Amino acid sequence: MDYKNIDFCHDYDDGKILSDLNDADVILLGPSRVGKTPLSFYMGYFDLKVCNIPLVPEANLTEMLKSLPREKTFGLTRSVDSIRKHRLSREENLGINSNYATEERIFDELMYAHDIYKTLRIPVIDLDKMAIEEATVFISKRISK
């Protein structure tokens, strides 16, 4: 197995690199703890170069996001409760207490993300309703058209 696509997923994980996005086969957008990284790496094992970008209202990436190629850009979502469960676990593991896991913060981030998805006119995948394997098939079919 050639791991170059896994290396690509690692290098482009969590918005670490926002240049040369045309090299990516797939671009995933979503709030923190929505499932971008597991989906990215799973797709990497299937020979896809995946970049994932966290959507944080304070980062104000709207103009940059408008330049993304829509045919390979996908929005990810989950319920507030699902994201909150993952964020509370993360806070506990890190020994911190912040507004990162509050329902209000998560709701605001989801609203921001969905506004971006609507502006970009991209497909939205609910990872509460679709396993990463199913999401991979869905995305693969969309990008191979």
Residue ranges, per PLM feature:
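Small-molecule kinase domains that catalyze NTP-dependent phosphoryl transfer to phosphate-bearing small molecules
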Residues: Y3-D13, S98-A135
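Internal active-site segments that recognize and position negatively charged phosphoryl groups
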Residues: Y3-K49
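Hydrophobic/aromatic beta-strand patches that form the interior of the parallel beta-sheet core
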Residues: C51-I53, K72-L76, P123-I125
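Terminal helix/beta-alpha structural elements that buttress the NAD(P)+-binding lobe
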Residues: P54-L55, P123, K141-K145
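Conserved nucleotide-binding/hydrolysis micro-motifs of P-loop NTPases
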Residues: P57-A59, S79-I83, A131-I132
